[in-house]
Amino acid sequence: MKATWDKLENNWMQFEVEVDASEFSKSVEAAFRKMNRQVTIPGFRRGKAPRAVFERVYGKEALVQEAVDQILPRAYSEALEQGQIEPISQPEIEVVQAEDGKPLIFKGKVQVTPEVTLGRLSGFGIEKQVPEVTDQEVEEQLSALRERLATLVTDESGEVGQGSFAVIDFEGFIDGEPFEGGKGEGYTVEIGSGTFIPGFEEGLVGAKAGETREVTVTFPEDYHAQHLAGKQAVFKVTVHEVKKKELPELNDEFAQQVSPFKTVEELRADIKNRLSEAAAQKAEEDFRNKVVEAVADDASVEVPEVLVHDKVHDMIHDFEHQLAQQGITLDMWHQITGKTHEDLHKELEPQATKLVKVDLVLAAVAKQVGLTVSDAELEAEFDRLLAMYPKQQSYIRQLRASAAYRAQLRRDLLKQKTVEHLVELNSAA
């Protein structure tokens, strides 16, 4: 087999592939044997009809087309390997010649991984900065713990104020008529939380337990229920009870309730240690990101649109998954925000372009430095996944048997190894 490759503009390459006549004839014969077993020709058992009879009934063109379908993907893959070409798009292929007894010739073009011109890999003067945990941060964590164990008790004053919890019945009216979703009973609202429409909670300030009052509000123009957006409504609200939040006392008993420690001081020390560990971890992550960003910024590469499009597609898929965890579909999100799919795509493009450039630069660094991922390292990662997710054994074994997933995991591991290499270079600098 012969293959020629020529560069075009914008990371495209054109190719022409010629498969030997003898090899193509073997493929045509293999196509005949396969198709002969699949059809019935009168007077012959399935698979036993002579080729001449088969061709008279179904035509020689059917055999040639089947042979092309079988050999072309294999020949294209071999051509990529011969030319050491890394495609980033599906090829556009045209069959030039396909006749039994003659070479199979096809040509086409494909977009390939762009050339990356690397700059510096180190010497950026990036320093790892680990902030010291303050006493205020520790106290904020303690306050959050107290908030979690807070209880609501009756406010003896009986008057609604900022921070109060009012137990209410309410019904809303627009132009004197009640509307769907505008009624509730025994609802507890925290004044100042912003849970309700702007103006509703403020309208309850000063109300007494047992009092009924009217609160006038205007629904926001971007309100999710479009039939209510921008409209004025009057809510009839009855305050049944006023409560206030009561925090547990910060003492040793509290420490024992929320932790395995016996004293508040031990709890404080543990919180400070955990905050320090988190700060160190974040500092390490920030350092890694800054190093990778600096290396990418110092390199030059023409980022292909097809890769940006694919990255945006992946990002939208991830976003859709995040929404699903909140019980929201992407269509619902579009309705709530008023943004179209095209708007979302356009918003994500700059970030996607940056991410694609980073991937291309890291791949170029790995190639220049000579970093690789061995089969042993790949298998070790699968073993690690099996140990980490004991309930997913069957699924992980399926992934282990998938050539596509193995290739993806190898790329991910190589990317990790490359980042570690750059971090090491810049830590020593």
Curated annotation (Swiss-Prot):
Which coarse location class describes where this protein primarily resides? cytoplasm
One of the protein's GO biological processes = cell division
TM regions (residue ranges)? none
Which residues are in the PPIase FKBP-type domain? 163-248
The EC class name is: isomerase
Q: What is its EC number?
A: 5.2.1.8
Q: Which Pfam families match?
A: FKBP_C, Trigger_C, Trigger_N
**Highest taxon above the source species:** Bacteria
Record's keyword terms, sorted: Cell cycle, Cell division, Chaperone, Cytoplasm, Isomerase, Rotamase
Q: Kindly list the GO molecular function terms attached to this UniProt entry.
A: peptidyl-prolyl cis-trans isomerase activity; protein folding chaperone; ribosome binding
Q: Where, per UniProt, does this protein localize?
A: Cytoplasm
Reaction(s) the record says it catalyses: [protein]-peptidylproline (omega=180) = [protein]-peptidylproline (omega=0)
- What cellular-component terms does GO give this entry? cytoplasm
Q: What does this protein do?
A: Involved in protein export. Acts as a chaperone by maintaining the newly synthesized protein in an open conformation. Functions as a peptidyl-prolyl cis-trans isomerase.
Member of which family? Belongs to the FKBP-type PPIase family. Tig subfamily.
Q: What does UniProt say about this protein's domains?
A: Consists of 3 domains; the N-terminus binds the ribosome, the middle domain has PPIase activity, while the C-terminus has intrinsic chaperone activity on its own.
What name does this protein carry? Trigger factor
